[in-house]
Amino acid sequence: ADHDEPEFSYLSWAGMLFAAGISITLFFFCVSEPLTHLVQPPQGEALNADAARQAMQVLFLHWGLHGWGVFAFVGMALAYFAYRHNLPLALRSALYPLIGKRINGPIGYAVDGFGIIATVFGLGADMGFGVLHLNSGLDYLFGIAHTQWIQVGLITLMMGAAILVAVAGVDKGVRVMSDINMLLACALLLFVLFAGPTQHLLNTLIQNIGDYLGALPSKSFDVYAYDKPSDWLGGWTVFYWAWWIAWSPFVGLFIARISRGRTIREFVFGVLLIPLGFTLAWMSIFGNSAIDQVLNHGMVALGQSAIDDPSMS
């Protein structure tokens, strides 16, 4: 409604937007993906400055406006019909202009069911990335080997923590965890920035943003039609689009739930720009730190390890 007040502060809202849209995959791919593109670029020669720029350009494409645009579109549609038309906060409500009250029938329930299935697949992919990353870290630090039982235990711990947060509710559970998550992520980002080649990382961040925005229209339609046939597009870009779409029902519903009382302008700014800005900064700083080690410090093996074992990157 017009006079609804926001339920959460702007900072907490931004933290929950960030936590909802970006999971363990932000840690998993921030180093492994740019290094993989550096060593095996979709176009041109590998392991040079052009390959580095292309790697970051592709990385930004996969984690940029396209994905957050999907989340914003779904979230805004659900919020509009839920808070303006008093419809259920469910996927089927977005079909109200097309099928009217039949959203409360078999068609509407089928849409909700498809949304649940898509979310399960998206959650499964993220859980897999997270478990591999955690197990690799435990192996590196404490010698805890990769075993099926260790991974089952990690999955159980992750699910248990998620259940506890969900039971605590949005205000006492999700909001608090999102605030902690954002603070820890910012602290880690600043540590990498200032412990590494700070000036170089800031320069590459500016250049990466410029390269991304300049090539955004052409890269959005680039299917590498004139290059030699390969499975690169399906293994990377198509995978990402499917991943963002699979997560959109869950993330869209959550964004709509926490955004009551926000204006459309606030909503668009918050969902598109706040998490997007942090994501691009994170990817640039971590990605260019790794690329710098490969190109300027002779750690070529690090690039190959991103291909052989991405979870250790």
What are these regions (language model features)?
Residues 1-51, 167, 190:
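N-terminal alpha-helical transmembrane segments of multi-pass membrane transport
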Residues 29-33, 124-141, 153, 186-223, ...:
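Hydrophobic alpha-helical segments and their helix-loop junctions in multi-pass secondary transporters
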Residues 5-7, 134-151, 169-183, 203-211, ...:
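Transmembrane helix-loop boundary segments of multi-pass membrane transporters
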Residues 214-230, 287-313:
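Membrane-interface interhelical connector segments
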Residues 16-25, 72, 115-124, 152-167, ...:
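Selective recognition of specific alpha-helical transmembrane segments in multi-pass small-molecule
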Residues 53-76, 151-157, 223-248, 311-313:
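Hydrophobic alpha-helical transmembrane segments
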Residues 22-26, 61-132, 140-164, 195-198:
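Helix-loop-helix module between adjacent transmembrane segments
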Residues 1-7, 55-62, 77-87, 136-141, ...:
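Membrane-water interface regions at transmembrane-helix termini and the short interhelical loops
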